[in-house]
């Protein structure tokens, strides 16, 4: 068996096409979604990632609002920009690019974001709403990577209801919120959360129908550990220096796992494009909610 590819690039392209239509519909209502980014410092990886987000915006018609500060910016200067983006009506959603400099209280900055403009879906209030809402409509953004995993599988016709999903990793961006997204009634998976300190990982991998590897530990999931027909999404990223002295980026899953898997999301090209497109979806949905709110307020005023 050789795994079929869960193609994140093609799936993201299809979702972008749908988003273009929604952005056009918003334009007819006199509203244009705007994605803001706040980048502190000159980290090359962060600069590249932010630039990619704004290229994505241009593809679907979302306005780009870019704010940059030097690495030695004070916490108060950063918070000033956060407040500015909170108040800017052109900005319907934004992200603070992480990591922030060590002298900055990252949690304080993230909590200062207006929850209605939280494009990453990671504000404590929005995570709390996700905890409290098991089913039905959720009028707050979902965390981008877990939502991207679900959409990637859905677009390939892979059913998650009733399946045992093993999530490896306990980070706030993927591992911890993944269980909340996957156990919503509309998805209905059964989730086990493991991490690098889990002592029975081999046992859990052997029984998992789906594996989402997001621990940031290079090639920690091997063919010997998984069962035939498993569905694997490789989300982890590790930078490893080889014997030749060159640095390369590796995922959490040994590529040889594809010989046992039914479906596999490669790294890169699998979940990464989905994370970025779900960010766009959150921004568009925020603009739609704001436009609907304005219409409701107008109707009330005219009543």
From Swiss-Prot:
Transmembrane segments: none annotated. The gene is folD. GO terms for biological process: L-histidine biosynthetic process; methionine biosynthetic process; purine nucleotide biosynthetic process; tetrahydrofolate interconversion. NADP(+) binds at residues 169-171, 196, 237. Pathway: One-carbon metabolism; tetrahydrofolate interconversion. One of its GO terms (cellular component) is cytosol. One of its GO terms (molecular function) is methylenetetrahydrofolate dehydrogenase (NADP+) activity. Gene3D superfamilies: Leucine Dehydrogenase, chain A, domain 1, NAD(P)-binding Rossmann-like Domain. Keywords: Amino-acid biosynthesis, Histidine biosynthesis, Hydrolase, Methionine biosynthesis, Multifunctional enzyme, NADP, One-carbon metabolism, Oxidoreductase, Purine biosynthesis. NCBIfam families: PRK14193.1 (NF010789). This is Bifunctional protein FolD. Catalyzes the oxidation of 5,10-methylenetetrahydrofolate to 5,10-methenyltetrahydrofolate and then the hydrolysis of 5,10-methenyltetrahydrofolate to 10-formyltetrahydrofolate. Homodimer. InterPro entries: Aminoacid_DH-like_N_sf, NAD(P)-bd_dom_sf, THF_DH/CycHdrlase, THF_DH/CycHdrlase_cat_dom, THF_DH/CycHdrlase_NAD-bd_dom. Belongs to the tetrahydrofolate dehydrogenase/cyclohydrolase family. It holds the Pfam family THF_DHG_CYH_C. The lineage of its organism: Bacteria, Bacillati, Actinomycetota, Actinomycetes, Micrococcales. It comes from the Bacteria. Its EC number is 1.5.1.5, 3.5.4.9. It catalyses: (6R)-5,10-methylene-5,6,7,8-tetrahydrofolate + NADP(+) = (6R)-5,10-methenyltetrahydrofolate + NADPH; (6R)-5,10-methenyltetrahydrofolate + H2O = (6R)-10-formyltetrahydrofolate + H(+).
